[in-house]
UniProtKB/Swiss-Prot annotation:
Residue spans, topological domain Extracellular: 225-243, 304-312, 364-394
Region feature (Disordered): 1-107
Primary subcellular site in the record, as a coarse category: other
Expression sites (tissue/organ): Expressed in the epidermis of the skin. Expressed in epithelial cells of the outermost layer of the stratum granulosum (SG) and hair follicles (at protein level).
Transmembrane as UniProt keyword: yes
Protein name: Transmembrane protein 79
Positions in the Cytoplasmic compartment: 1-203, 265-282, 334-342
Organismal lineage: Eukaryota, Metazoa, Chordata, Craniata, Vertebrata
Keywords: Golgi apparatus, Lysosome, Membrane, Transmembrane, Transmembrane helix
Protein's cellular compartments: Lysosome; Golgi apparatus, trans-Golgi network; Membrane
Disease (UniProt): Defects in TMEM79 may be associated with susceptibility to atopic dermatitis. Atopic dermatitis is a complex, inflammatory disease with multiple alleles at several loci thought to be involved in the pathogenesis. It commonly begins in infancy or early childhood and is characterized by a chronic relapsing form of skin inflammation, a disturbance of epidermal barrier function that culminates in dry skin, and IgE-mediated sensitization to food and environmental allergens. It is manifested by lichenification, excoriation, and crusting, mainly on the flexural surfaces of the elbow and knee.
């Protein structure tokens, strides 16, 4: 730009700054802004005077630069508002307009909150923090489960969450494993339970049939005799000595139970029980209980048996030991026919109890609570016991 163009621009800026009272619109190239009375602005007159001395090309370049400068000056921020020296004129008829009442602005969040909560975080900062609801952490009580009954079928169903009602394939397998016991292929219809019940009953029935047969066969065909035991004390001592052999399966079970505790690292007394350890523990506990009941009745039976039938004492002792070993084996395998081994122990115990009660109340009631010798061991009393049976009614 030449010196004349620079001077023209400075004069335009000086003249526009005090006279601008409203934002000016953009003026296209080649047009001049018109005033209210149609008179041109003094800045434009000076521009024309200054540019008339130059060449035509310079005049056209000056006009283009002036138009672009005026358009840029109209968009500047300091020219958009009214200047304090030139107040904005009031529009005509503004006094006829009634002022509208000011709308009540809604209270902000900080104004609505009480004074105690005035030190809360701002809204934007509070979005970064997620409040913790204790009700979401606590487990829902059992009373919250919704139980509905279908009107048609009349069956009550407990509605569970959708994740439980439609489990994943892995969860479905676990659910089926819990509902259906291992080795059950009936699909949960209940036929496997009936089969297990039938097997248990059949095994106990087989023990009921074989128990007297085994006892009679051993009594008749085993070649050994019992020594002469005329006194009650000698019979009790003989019975207790026979009971030592019956403790063999119990002691063996205790040893295996201790080894299982060491092998499976289940030394914690209140830890989670394991199947390999619980099998032997239950066997030992049950065997000790049956041993006490079995030999208590066997000792009482030895005081009532005649001399010829004292051979039953060692036979019943051996039957107890064998039956306990059979039960232990079948219980460890997990078969339902373990009732056979249990029946070989419980049925002789029940038979001895019935025999003792029969002798105490029917055959020899006078010796129920005394320690006298049995009259069945003497030759003169070798006759039938019915000849000497006292009647309670006389």
């Amino acid at each position: 730009m030449t010196e004349q163009e620079t001077l023209a621009l400075l004069e335009v800026k000086r003249s526009d700054s005090p006279e601008k009272s409203s934002p000016q619109a953009l003026v296209p190239n080649g047009r001049q802004p018109e005033g209210e009375g149609g008179a041109e602005s003094p800045g434009a007159e000076s521009l024309r005077v200054g540019s008339s001395a130059g060449s035509p090309t310079a005049i056209e370049g000056a006009e283009d630069g002036l138009d672009s400068t005026v358009s840029e000056a109209a968009t500047l921020p300091w020219g958009t508002g009214p200047q304090p020296s030139a107040p904005f004129p009031d529009p005509p008829g503004w006094r006829d307009i009634e002022p509208e009442p000011p709308e009540s602005e809604p209270l902000t969040k900080l104004e609505e909150l009480p004074e105690d909560d005035a030190n809360l975080l701002p809204e934007k900062a509070a979005r970064a923090f997620v409040p913790i609801d204790l009700q979401c952490i606590e487990r829902q009580p059992q009373e919250d489960l919704i139980v509905r009954c279908e009107a048609g079928e009349g069956e009550c169903r407990t509605f569970m969450p959708p994740r439980v009602t439609h489990p994943d394939p892995t969860e479905r397998k676990w659910a089926e494993a819990v509902v259906r016991p291992p080795g059950c292929s009936c699909g949960g219809c209940g036929s496997c339970g009936d089969r297990e019940w039938l097997r248990a009953v059949a095994s106990v029935g087989a023990a009921l049939i074989l128990f007297p047969c085994l006892l009679y066969g051993a009594y008749a065909f085993l070649p050994f005799d019992v020594p002469r035991l005329p006194t009650m004390s000698s019979r009790l001592i003989y019975t207790l000595r026979c009971g030592v052999f019956a403790t063999f399966p119990i002691v063996l079970g205790i040893l295996v139970y201790g080894l299982s505790l060491l092998c499976f690292s289940a030394l914690r007394p209140f830890g989670e029980p394991r199947r390999e350890v619980e099998i032997h523990r239950r066997y030992v506990a049950q065997s000790v209980q049956l041993f006490i009941l079995y030999f208590f009745n066997l000792a009482v039976l030895s005081t009532y048996l005649p001399q010829d039938t004292l051979k039953l004492l060692p036979l019943l002792t051996g039957l107890f030991a064998v039956s306990r070993l059979i039960y232990w084996l079948t219980f460890a395998v997990g078969r339902s026919f373990r009732g056979f081994g249990y029946g070989l122990t419980f049925l002789p115990l029940l038979s001895m109890l019935m025999w003792n009660l029969y002798y105490m109340f029917v055959v020899e009631p006078e010796r129920m609570l005394t320690a006298t010798e049995s009259r069945l061991d003497y030759p003169d009393h070798a006759r039938s016991a019915s000849d000497y049976r006292p009647r309670p009614w006389g």
